[in-house]
Amino acid sequence: MNPLNRILTILLLTLVSPWAHGQSFSLAPLPYPHDALAPVIDEQTMRIHHGRHHQAYVDNLNKAVAAAPALAGLSLEALMAQISKTGDAVRNNGGGHWNHTFFWQSMTRPGQGGAPSPALLAAINRDFGSLDQFKAAFKAAGLGRFGSGWAWLIVTTDGKLKITSTPNQDNPLMDIVADRGQPILGNDVWEHAYYLQYQNRRGDYLDAWWQVVDWNVISRRYADAQK
């Protein structure tokens, strides 16, 4: 690259990089009031989980990216795709930011989440036998995750549905996980997600959670993953 083109490239990167203008990742408001998921998830849990835990992931992600100029301007999804090259701070906090944003958007008021679309239900029946069998397998993934982590439903590269789980704030978009794919559903099984209300009864939390799953959103994600 000749010197003039190099200068132009640097100027362009400076213009498009959000960090060059003091911008950064931010915490979006919840898509519903803090008490909207009660009695499945109580208001206090939501306020602490979103306003403190998720906010901390965002703040620490911004610090990590600011300290790594090569990452400036990359989207959250782009960071996930090359997480093996970013270091633990971006892995933990970038994963925490992506996972929680995805999690909030997966839920709605109890009883308002509808049902899986015909296409998604057909895929669930094909790959798990029935919706009830899928829910049982998903619960097993959440219970089987030792310590902190997530349970996921992903669409694999061959279009199949698969249940997986990840430790800490890893997710199936990351290039370091064993089972990569497009997530369409995920549940947080860190204790801060449920302990105020359910204490050590993770299984009860996993059972109750289906009441707030927004199947309309999950069905749209499945349709998008098929494109």
Listing of model-derived features with the role each one plays in the protein:
Residues M1-L8:
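Bacterial N-terminal signal peptides that target proteins for export
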